[in-house]
């Protein structure tokens, strides 16, 4: 029996380094950043949720359910993950940021294979050099653990997942897959890379 996998795209941050612009809606090569992300993951999952804490109406125009953090105060990616984990009945939830327009087209199958090979609860993607703490495949049943971690004042995703049985899924063969956009300068460099 194949596993059912849903996804959440995290677009709930304040994007301070982008001058406060909503990163998911910033245009890259004529399309909103999040549209690039949607196009990469849509064929790999059953349902997509968009986690947004502002501009929810604009995000809804992409045709997917928009969810806002159940914890107020822009508490970071953990808050978005917790909310999404409570909105899915899938076997696994794929977590990706809204500003990674080059995500692997084989992201889900490789992360799922890594989980199954190790009988792990969580797979975290790696570019071969660094783990990508907000590119995860995890079991929604871990929600209570994550919620307790956040409510204890913790914010770092990697500090949470190291407490669980996790496996690293390497994408060293796609070193640019997780390039993201945090500044206008990075956006310009990425726009050039996409057109090459």
UniProtKB/Swiss-Prot annotation:
Alphabetical keyword list: Cytoplasm, GTP-binding, Magnesium, Metal-binding, Molybdenum cofactor biosynthesis, Nucleotide-binding, Transferase
Pfam families given in the database record: NTP_transf_3 (PF12804)
GO CC terms of this entry: cytoplasm
Name used for this protein in its record: Molybdenum cofactor guanylyltransferase
UniProt cofactor(s): Mg(2+)
UniProt record similarity statement: Belongs to the MobA family.
Organism of derivation: Shewanella sp. (strain W3-18-1)
Principal cellular location given in the protein's record: cytoplasm
GO biological process: bis(molybdopterin guanine dinucleotide)molybdenum biosynthetic process
Reactions listed under catalytic activity: Mo-molybdopterin + GTP + H(+) = Mo-molybdopterin guanine dinucleotide + diphosphate
């Amino acid at each position: 029996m194949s596993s059912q996998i849903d996804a959440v795209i995290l677009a709930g941050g304040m994007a301070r380094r982008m001058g406060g612009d909503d990163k998911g809606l910033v245009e890259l090569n004529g399309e909103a950043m999040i549209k690039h992300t949607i196009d990469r993951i849509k064929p790999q999952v059953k349902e997509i949720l968009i986690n947004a804490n502002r501009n929810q109406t604009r995000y809804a125009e992409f045709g997917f359910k928009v969810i806002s953090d159940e914890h107020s105060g822009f508490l970071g990616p953990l808050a978005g993950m917790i909310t999404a984990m409570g909105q899915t009945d899938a076997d696994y939830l794929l977590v990706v940021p809204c500003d990674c327009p080059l995500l692997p087209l084989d992201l889900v199958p490789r992360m799922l294979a890594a989980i199954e090979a190790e009988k792990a609860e969580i797979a975290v993607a790696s570019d071969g050099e660094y783990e990508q703490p907000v590119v995860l495949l995890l079991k929604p049943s871990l929600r209570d653990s994550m919620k307790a971690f956040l409510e204890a004042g913790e914010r770092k995703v990697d500090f949470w997942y190291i407490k669980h049985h996790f496996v690293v899924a390497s994408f060293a063969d796609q070193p640019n897959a997780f390039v993201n956009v945090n500044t206008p300068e990075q956006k310009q460099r990425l726009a050039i890379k996409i057109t090459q």
